[in-house]
């Protein structure tokens, strides 16, 4: 079975507060991209283990891979005994904030549900995937959404304008944990602008969108990898886009 795993961008991202569980309460706008990984998911009839492989050798595919975690969580929830092979044809950049690992996990779940003919509500899927990673519930929805808290609250919305996106990634990557550690070290103040940005998208108000789009993690990321600022400076020479 073939499943596509779509990348996302955070058009804006705010951090509201720290959580007792070590995560952060977020408020962000996530938009799906056409860029996607392709997963081949199949049942293993005579196996006592699951296998995840990938054509990008930089991807960690051990037991801590999100696809492995998803399969184990699904097995515990629904009690099935079957095992699976998942092969990932990787197109989404690693360590680029595009949610590739989360998208792969969500695609794996969709494949398992279809192969085993599991009847599950969207609420069940959101609850299950929220235990795997903050971006995985959105990857199940895969629509423009305001995403809140730990990623489990999704507010889908629609807008008409079609956007072209240029993705530029430095050769080096950044881990999410590394960026949030730097954010906590430096301190932060919530911006509370997500509603205004959503409204500007819906109303096709490009000027308001340009004035307010932001990512609170940008500062920590640039502190760790200054090359990001160099890329922004180059892109800012083309004033018609959002950087």
Regions found by a protein language model. Name each.
Residues 105, 109-146:
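Contiguous, small/hydrophobic- and glycine-enriched helical/loop subdomains that border
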Residues 1-96, 114, 118-123, 159-160, ...:
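ATP-binding N-lobe of GHMP and related small-molecule kinases
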Residues 87-116, 134, 241-243:
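Glycine/serine-rich anion-binding loops at beta->alpha junctions
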Residues 141, 146-241:
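Conserved, helical-rich catalytic subdomain that frames metal- and/or nucleotide-binding sites
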Residues 28-30, 136, 152-158:
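A generic local secondary-structure boundary/capping motif
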Residues 46-60, 108, 130, 205-214:
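Short, basic/glycine-rich phosphate-binding loops at helix/coil junctions
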């Amino acid at each position: 079975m073939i499943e596509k795993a779509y990348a996302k961008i955070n058009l804006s991202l705010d951090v509201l507060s720290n959580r007792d569980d070590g995560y952060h309460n977020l408020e962000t706008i996530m938009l799906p991209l056409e860029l996607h990984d392709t997963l081949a998911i199949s049942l293993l009839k005579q196996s006592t283990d699951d296998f995840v492989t990938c054509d990008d050798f930089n991807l960690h595919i051990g037991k801590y891979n999100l696809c492995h975690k998803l399969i184990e969580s699904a097995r515990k929830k629904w009690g099935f005994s079957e095992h699976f092979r998942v092969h990932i044809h990787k197109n989404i950049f690693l360590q680029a904030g595009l949610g590739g690992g989360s998208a792969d996990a969500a695609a794996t779940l969709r494949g398992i549900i279809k192969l085993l003919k599991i009847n599950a509500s969207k609420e069940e899927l959101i609850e299950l995937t929220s235990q795997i990673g903050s971006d995985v519930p959105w990857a199940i929805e895969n629509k423009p959404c305001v995403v809140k808290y730990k990623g489990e609250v999704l507010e889908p919305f629609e807008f008409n304008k079609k956007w072209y996106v240029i993705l530029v990634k430095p050769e080096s990557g950044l881990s999410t944990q590394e960026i949030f550690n730097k954010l906590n070290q430096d301190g932060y103040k919530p911006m509370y602008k997500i509603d205004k940005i959503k409204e500007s998208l819906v109303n096709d108000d490009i000027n308001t969108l340009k004035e307010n789009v932001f990512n609170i993690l940008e500062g920590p990321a640039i502190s760790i990898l200054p090359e990001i600022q160099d890329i922004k400076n180059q892109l800012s020479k083309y004033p018609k886009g959002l950087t």
